[in-house]
From Swiss-Prot:
One of its GO terms (cellular component) is cytosol. This is Glycerol kinase 2. Its EC number is 2.7.1.30. ATP binds at residues 13-15, 267, 310, 314, 411. The gene is glpK2. Homotetramer and homodimer (in equilibrium). Pfam families: FGGY_C (PF02782), FGGY_N (PF00370). It is an enzyme of class 2 (transferase). Key enzyme in the regulation of glycerol uptake and metabolism. Catalyzes the phosphorylation of glycerol to yield sn-glycerol 3-phosphate. Activated by phosphorylation and inhibited by fructose 1,6-bisphosphate (FBP). Coiled coil: none annotated. Glycerol binds at residues 83-84, 135, 245-246. InterPro entries: ATPase_NBD, Carb_kinase_FGGY, Carb_kinase_FGGY_CS, FGGY_C, FGGY_N, Glycerol_kin. It comes from Lactiplantibacillus plantarum (strain ATCC BAA-793 / NCIMB 8826 / WCFS1) (Lactobacillus plantarum).
Length: 508
């Protein structure tokens, strides 16, 4: 009898990965394909949703070929995805009517600011658990309907569909038969009432978004549909698990109990705490969101979202050409001795939690003639940890906990220097996942549970493995001094945003 596996599609901000896992939760094979981002104007970030679908199709084929696994050996498919990113497409042709507007994009900031000015921020917070920001899908939908000719009328006639990336991929995989999302992705749209678990008609009316274009919201672990036989060599495979990337990582880290916290270092960095079955609205600009919904039960989460983390290392590599690869940043940081006076504030698309400041832009402070490439790279790495501490401290205040342990995953978590500095500056024990692909693993677990590949959460716990542990070892006065410098750097960057500079003006 042939071995059986679970396939996970991990659709990220810069690349797509498809990973095959065995019953022990171990990665058997993976395939990855990058796709471009588009920047039509400063602060705007877009994708071509068709390019995303092509990347997914390519990695599915490649991983099966590379692993020499037949499609009929795949028991189920799980999907995890960059959240908030918004696609609107023609229901008949299946073609997007505009580029996908990415979660990082600030092109809808004026819409969000107008909602706040109109006094809608409190209502949106109470109903959705979110702050009113361009980060979420709601204003992105409104922008597309406003800027594509005839889109509003077509949406009202039921000719257009909206989806976050999970919805788009399920639609494509099922040949246009299934238009669904899950609780976690719905909770990131700024249109979903996290208390009654329905699309919020008050907010839909406020933004004049037709309900007809919205997907059905389902649990995180159930069979949503099956793949079309022409996609996987004749096999019809159940698609049975879906979760936004950060919730999938929380699930993959086995953070099933209230108070458990994980931090994922991806393109951005995202600290998420399991709140249990009772939502708790933040008093300090964190997000209340849905962690997962299983078997009729909903677990909520508190989240701090940092817009720039791993993308800062991409900037060092591609924009500044200070490193040739992300791993090189670790060795360079080790070469920088006692030069902690340099601070990089990587607010390339504004500041996320707990500031929620869309106008501040990136800045560097503390440069001297003696500053080296290694110092600059180290300061950029430190900015990831400083931002994470901002969120950790805020989360402690909101949830009234001590948080002795932080579970970490994601690409930048491979950096030992960064993980030690994170432990030091936050004064918490860091436990790194044995396999940093916990996002995909979480999606695989959700899919496997739905089809009986794994029986329950206890079975998942029995196969869970952890990796390296990093204990804090920095003296308290040094920790306080470094963090005070970071806070001053953030304030200085925020002050600079008020300086009237025309970025489009020419000096010629």
């Amino acid at each position: 009898m042939s071995a059986k596996y679970i396939m996970a599609i991990d659709e990220g901000t810069t690349s797509t990965r498809t990973i095959i896992f065995n019953h022990a939760g171990q990665k058997v094979a993976d395939a990855q394909k990058e796709f471009p981002q588009y920047f039509p104007q400063p602060g705007w970030v877009e994708h071509d949703a068709t390019e995303i679908w092509n990347a997914v199709s390519s990695t599915i084929a490649n991983v099966l070929i590379d692993a020499n696994i037949k499609p009929n050996q795949i028991e189920a498919i799980g999907i995890t995805n960059q959240r908030e990113t918004t696609v609107v497409w023609d229901k008949q042709t299946g073609l997007p009517i505009y580029n996908a507007i990415v979660w990082q994009s600030r092109q809808t900031a004026p819409l969000a600011e107008q909602l706040i000015a109109d006094g809608m921020g409190d209502l949106i917070h109470r109903h959705t658990g979110l702050v009113t920001d361009a980060y979420f899908s709601a204003t992105k939908i409104r922008w597309i309907l406003d800027h594509v000719d005839g889109a509003q009328k077509r949406a009202e006639r039921g000719e257009l569909l909206f989806g976050t990336i999970d919805t788009w991929l399920v639609w494509k995989l099922t040949g246009g038969e299934t238009h669904v999302t899950d609780y976690t992705n719905a909770s990131r749209t700024m249109l979903f009432n996290i208390h009654d678990l329905q699309w919020d008609q008050t907010i839909l009316n406020l933004l004049n978004i037709p309900a007809a274009m919205l997907p059905e919201v389902r649990s995180n672990s159930e069979i949503y549909g099956t793949t079309k036989d022409y996609l996987l060599y004749g096999s019809q495979i159940p698609i049975s698990g879906m979760a936004g990337d950060q919730q999938a990582a929380l699930f993959g880290q086995m953070a099933f109990e209230p108070g458990m916290v994980k931090n994922t270092y991806g393109t951005g960095a995202f600290t998420v705490m399991n709140l249990g079955e009772q939502p708790q609205l933040s008093d300090h600009n964190l997000l209340t969101t849905i962690a997962y919904g299983l078997d009729g039960n909903i677990n909520y989460a508190l989240e701090g979202s940092i817009f720039v983390a791993g993308s800062a290392l991409q900037w060092l590599r591609d924009g500044m050409q200070l490193i040739e690869s992300a791993p090189e940043s670790e060795s360079l940081a080790q070469q920088s001795h006692n030069h902690n006076e340099v601070y990089v504030v990587p607010a390339f698309t504004g500041l996320g939690a707990p500031y929620w400041d869309s106008e501040t832009r990136g800045a560097v402070f503390g440069l001297t003639r003696g500053t080296t490439r290694a110092d600059f790279v180290k300061a950029t790495l430190q900015s990831l940890a400083y931002q994470s501490r901002d969120v950790i401290d805020t989360m402690k205040n909101d949830a009234n906990i001590t948080m002795p342990t932080l579970m970490v995953d994601g690409g930048a978590a491979r950096n030992n220097w960064l993980m030690q500095f994170q432990a030091d500056i936050s004064n918490v024990k860091i436990i790194r996942a044995a396999d940093l692909e916990t996002t995909a693993l979480g999606a695989a677990f959700l899919a496997g549970l739905a089809v009986g590949y794994w029986q329950d959460l206890d079975e998942l716990k029995s196969i869970h493995q952890t990796g390296n542990v990093f204990q804090p070892r920095m003296a308290a006065p040094q920790r306080a001094n470094l963090y005070q410098g970071w806070q001053a750097a953030v304030k200085a960057a925020q002050l600079f945003k008020h300086t009237p500079i025309d970025a489009q003006s020419s000096t010629n």
